[in-house]
Amino acid sequence: MNQNLALSNGRIFTEYQVLDNHAVLVNRDRILAIVPVSEIPGDFEVIDVQGGNICPGLIDLQIYGTGNDLFSAELTVESLSRIDNNLLKQGCTSYMPTLATNTLAVFKTAIDVFRKAQSKVALGLHLEGPFLNPAKR
């Protein structure tokens, strides 16, 4: 399978502009460049996105779960992995799994699970207080 892909025939949204007649060059999980369609290298497999939008991955800084998975209800590596995969399919490339105010024991379990999971998508944990502050316990 070719690891060099050119996403073309779509609208490309960059930080500053919207580009037509361009392609996004990708190798594995890295964006290499945005080039005019006429400059797509010969060793790239062209993927026609059929007029779709091409934009940077989205980031969600407070998410409790996705689909049937609620992280605080199932504090497991498997649950976190399912959340990762579901969010990636939806265009969310980074996120913060969130736990609502809870017991210290639940927070400690969540931290342990997060460390074991070694997620490449989750940026860290969002733990809601006020019980993180010793003076408020």
Regions picked out by a protein language model, each given a short descriptive name:
Residues 52-106:
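Metal-associated gating/positioning segment near the N- to mid-region
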Residues 22, 96-100, 126-128:
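A cross-family glycoside hydrolase active-site/sugar-binding cleft signature
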Residues 39-55:
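Active-site metal-binding motif and surrounding structural segment of the metallo-beta-lactamase
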Residues 6, 44-48, 124-126:
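Conserved beta-strand scaffold positions in the cores of enzyme catalytic domains, especially
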Residues 103-137:
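Histidine/acidic-residue-rich, glycine-tolerant segments that coordinate divalent metal ions
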Residues 1-40:
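N-terminal metal-binding scaffold of metallo-dependent hydrolase/deaminase domains
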Residues 10, 24, 29, 51, ...:
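Divalent metal-coordination and catalytic microenvironments
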